Amino acid sequence: MAMTVHCDIVSAEGEIFSGLVEMVIAHGDLGDLGIAMGHAPLITSLKPGPITLTKQGGEKEVFYISGGFLEVQPNMVKVLADTVQRAGDLDEASAQEAVKAAEKALNEKGADFDYSAAAVRLAEAAAQLRTLQQIRKK
């Protein structure tokens, strides 16, 4: 049996996952992170994208987060997400439409244009599509 660590994924809406996992893979601001038992303690911010959990027995479960923080302590990993969804609950058509709308907003800058808000919307929609692509690869 593989070594496990306790993982919690929570957002403002509440806890979406709590259990033992063999591995947590997340997209940190400085690159991808793979967290397993015995990982050094750390705290880092997370980019929008998938969080992949490898549960006991090798079963994988994927979640989408819109950003947040990851804390690693001995025997514990905690993901504090801005928002979180199970990857299977994402709507690909809505994500593609959001990408198109954000790209259109970036190309049609008006007087009251907020570049950073449009860029954030584009990054989140693109991250949702990446998450959907990742679960298709399973």
Swiss-Prot record:
Role this protein plays: Produces ATP from ADP in the presence of a proton gradient across the membrane.
Subcellular locations according to the entry: Cell inner membrane
Assigned keywords, A-Z: ATP synthesis, Cell inner membrane, Cell membrane, CF(1), Hydrogen ion transport, Ion transport, Membrane, Transport
Any Pfam family hit: ATP-synt_DE_N
Subunit record text: F-type ATPases have 2 components, CF(1) - the catalytic core - and CF(0) - the membrane proton channel. CF(1) has five subunits: alpha(3), beta(3), gamma(1), delta(1), epsilon(1). CF(0) has three main subunits: a, b and c.
Protein topology in the membrane: Peripheral membrane protein
Protein's UniProt name: ATP synthase epsilon chain
Organism: Pseudomonas fluorescens (strain SBW25)
Record gene name: atpC
SUPFAM superfamilies (UniProt xref): Epsilon subunit of F1F0-ATP synthase C-terminal domain (SSF46604), Epsilon subunit of F1F0-ATP synthase N-terminal domain (SSF51344)
GO molecular function: ATP binding; proton-transporting ATP synthase activity, rotational mechanism
A GO CC term attached to the entry: plasma membrane
Homology family: Belongs to the ATPase epsilon chain family.
